[in-house]
């Protein structure tokens, strides 16, 4: 029993930390591409009597081509992969020709780095082509490639990319049905963890755990929305994409609302039998493979509990919300169990061109100039530290700009890289001592570290650096060149490269962290206002069409950008500023769940009969209350920008009370909208008072 519980806990951890197994799939694909490339290239070098360094280049290209290609659709990913030999062979050729001319080769390297960043303006394909060109030039210098070796190096590149293409199209092809089933299973798994956080040991609730699990629930919902952007649900499941989006939205929001209601129940009071029955029924629906009999019993039990619920009591409201969650997850069970057996990949819709014009230099050009300056300085510093290992400083100066743009993000990235390098050196020395000259064991550790590096890279960049450093230690051991002094040089070169990267970020086309944070926050507040307006209009005019689900997902994506750009501010040296950023982000995350509830009220109203519209007086009062909440949003927006905001003349609570007194309002979208507006306003008001 104990081992079974441990297995269940481990399985739940994997599902929670990697919804849909996307990280597992990506890391496994990269590792398998590397292994296939190494096997093929070792055979190739043995047959052609070439040094093992030739195999190293092909293996690195295979790994990089697996990691760097991130086009949204499978067809685009294959096309990008097929294009990769062009920049790879071109970069190797340039490096081999320029290598005899010391400083000219350095200038060529910096030119390649500049171009690799500049082409990011062309989206994922440009980024992939640039990264592969950079890595190819780098390793051509590393192995001291000569012009005579260009044909054999080109062949090694072809073998490496062929290995990646084989894995991408044959071992891990695009499987829309399997992917969405994993994501839906993850949605259920995360929903159970949310329930556990608010139902088990009620007297010792862990608020941090509840927030973390609710955030994970929202992230899983966005992952399903991303799947819907890439695939047509009608070709894989028994519903259209719009219908699945609504079902998932219902399931997510109902669990969020239920968690909030259960959290606010008095921990000293016993729950009513109806609420307990509804929670048990919901747990049954959240199991992976319940039988049809179990699902029917869960529906019947939850419906009976909702019929008996006293809506004037908080426990009664929670019971009804639990029943709605049961209905939502039952619908998803029906959709996934009736999924079609096969699916054809739909052609991606062409991107809609935008007319937005940006002033000044393109961000990719600014970043390219920053990288050129940083890598030029890193070349000089790196050669002063070690004429043979200078490229590590250049590598660090380049990589700290990958995927980030603000000063704070780059500073954080440098910190992660230095910490990961130091820890990796320590681990590499320890493993080298324990393993010794044992090629099979060294190869196993090397492959394991590659998998861990790319499985954990999205958790923290330090993990990638840590495992890559261990890989280098194993690689030097295999080549017979391992020494502690070499790894110590890596630390020094990493620090030097990180330092010039930070200097370049602060003094060359600097992008302020706070300014970027304010920009992202303003975008979020604008989208929040749109959701408030659209939700209230749908409630006061039921039975119409609404795009609230898509608008809410856009709101969630905007919030993710706020959280991402706010992370450096939450780790700053100033205690007051750090805590203010933390409270603001937490407040926006809490308020976002109230916006979800309002959007759900609007979606439910859109399904209702137009005759169920509230009286005109109620509609007018609700619109006024919504305008008042929008004013509160505007006040928070001013506060974030450092401006002063005027206090409202009339409390929002009083205006919402006027809505309820205009007529006898039965349970339904209007009440749900009033409750959501009240919670949203209260949360945002608390943000302004505490930040």
Give each language-model segment a name.
Residues 1-218, 347-576:
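A transmembrane helix-and-boundary motif of multi-pass membrane transporters/channels
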Residues 1-39, 46-49, 69-70, 123, ...:
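Long, hydrophobic alpha-helical segments that serve as membrane-spanning/inserting helices
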Residues 86, 247, 419, 423, ...:
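Secondary-structure capping and boundary motifs in well-ordered enzyme cores
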Residues 226-246, 406-407, 431, 568-583:
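A cross-kingdom feature marking solvent-exposed beta-strand/loop segments within repeated
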Residues 254-262, 531-538, 588-605:
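Extended, well-ordered alpha-helical segments in internal regulatory regions
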Residues 442-450, 498, 599-603, 630-637:
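A short, terminal or domain-edge coil/loop segment
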Residues 568-613, 617:
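Structured cytosolic domains appended to multi-pass membrane proteins
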């Amino acid at each position: 029993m104990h081992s079974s519980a441990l297995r269940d806990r481990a399985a739940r951890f994997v599902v929670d930390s990697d919804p849909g197994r996307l990280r597992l799939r990506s890391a496994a694909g990269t590792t398998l591409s590397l292994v296939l490339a190494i096997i093929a290239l070792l055979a190739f070098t043995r047959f052609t009597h070439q040094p093992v360094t030739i195999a190293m280049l092909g293996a690195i290209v295979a790994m990089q081509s697996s990691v760097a290609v991130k086009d949204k659709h499978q067809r685009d990913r294959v096309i990008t992969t097929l294009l990769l030999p062009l920049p790879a062979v071109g970069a190797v050729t340039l490096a081999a020709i320029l290598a005899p001319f010391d400083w000219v080769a350095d200038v060529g390297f910096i030119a390649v780095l500049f171009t690799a960043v500049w082409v990011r303006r062309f989206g994922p394909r440009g980024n992939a082509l640039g990264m592969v060109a950079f890595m190819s030039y780098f390793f051509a210098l590393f192995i001291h490639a000569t012009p005579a070796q260009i044909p054999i190096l080109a062949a090694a590149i072809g073998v490496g990319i062929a290995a990646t293409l084989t894995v991408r199209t044959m071992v891990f092809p695009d499987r829309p049905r399997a992917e969405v089933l994993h994501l839906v299973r993850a949605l259920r798994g995360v929903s159970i963890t949310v329930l556990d956080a608010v139902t088990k040991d009620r007297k010792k609730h862990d608020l941090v755990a509840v927030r973390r699990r609710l955030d994970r629930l929202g992230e899983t919902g966005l992952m399903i929305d991303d799947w819907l952007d890439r695939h047509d649900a009608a070709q894989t499941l028994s519903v259209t994409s719009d219908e699945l989006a609504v079902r998932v939205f219902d399931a997510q929001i109902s669990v969020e609302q239920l968690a909030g209601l259960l959290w606010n129940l008095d921990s000293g009071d016993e729950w009513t039998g109806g609420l307990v029955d509804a929670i048990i029924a919901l747990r049954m629906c959240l199991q992976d493979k319940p039988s049809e009999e179990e699902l029917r019993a869960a529906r019947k039990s939850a419906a009976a509990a909702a019929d008996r619920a006293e809506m004037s009591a908080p426990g009664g409201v929670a019971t009804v919300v639990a029943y709605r969650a049961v209905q939502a997850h039952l619908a998803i069970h029906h959709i996934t169990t009736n999924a079609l057996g096969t699916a054809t990949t739909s052609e991606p819709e062409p991107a809609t061109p935008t007319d937005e014009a940006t002033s000044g230099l393109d961000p990719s050009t600014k970043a390219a100039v920053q990288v050129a300056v940083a890598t030029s300085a890193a070349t000089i510093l790196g050669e002063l530290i070690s004429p043979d290992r200078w490229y590590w400083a250049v590598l660090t100066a380049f990589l700290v700009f990958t995927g980030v743009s603000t000063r704070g993000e780059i500073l954080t990235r440098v910190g992660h890289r230095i910490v990961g390098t130091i820890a990796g050196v320590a681990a590499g020395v320890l493993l080298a001592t324990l393993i010794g000259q044992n090629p099979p064991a060294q190869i196993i550790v090397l492959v394991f570290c590659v998998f861990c590096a790319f499985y954990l890279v999205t958790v923290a960049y330090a993990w990638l650096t840590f495992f890559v450093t261990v890989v280098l230690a194993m690689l030097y051991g295999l080549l017979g060149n391992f020494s502690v002094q070499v790894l110590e040089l890596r630390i020094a070169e990493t620090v030097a490269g990180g330092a010039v990267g930070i200097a370049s970020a602060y003094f060359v086309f600097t992008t302020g962290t706070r300014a970027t944070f304010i920009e992202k926050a303003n975008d979020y507040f604008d989208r929040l206002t749109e959701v408030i307006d659209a939700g209230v209009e749908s409630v006061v005019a039921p039975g119409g069409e609404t795009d609230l689900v898509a608008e809410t997902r856009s709101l969630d994506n905007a919030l993710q950008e706020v959280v991402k750009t706010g992370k450096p501010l939450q780790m700053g040296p100033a205690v007051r500023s750090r805590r203010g950023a933390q409270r603001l982000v937490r407040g926006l995350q809490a308020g976002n769940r109230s916006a979800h509830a309002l959007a759900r009220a609007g979606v439910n109203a859109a399904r209702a009969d137009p005759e169920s519209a509230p009286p005109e007086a109620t509609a007018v009062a609700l619109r006024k209350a919504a305008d008042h909440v929008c004013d509160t949003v505007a006040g928070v927006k001013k506060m974030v920008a450092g401006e002063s905001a005027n206090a409202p003349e009339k409390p929002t609570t009083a205006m919402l009370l006027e809505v309820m007194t205009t007529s006898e309002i039965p349970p339904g979208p209007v009440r749900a909208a009033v409750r959501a507006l009240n919670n949203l306003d209260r949360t945002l008001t608390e943000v302004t008072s505490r930040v």
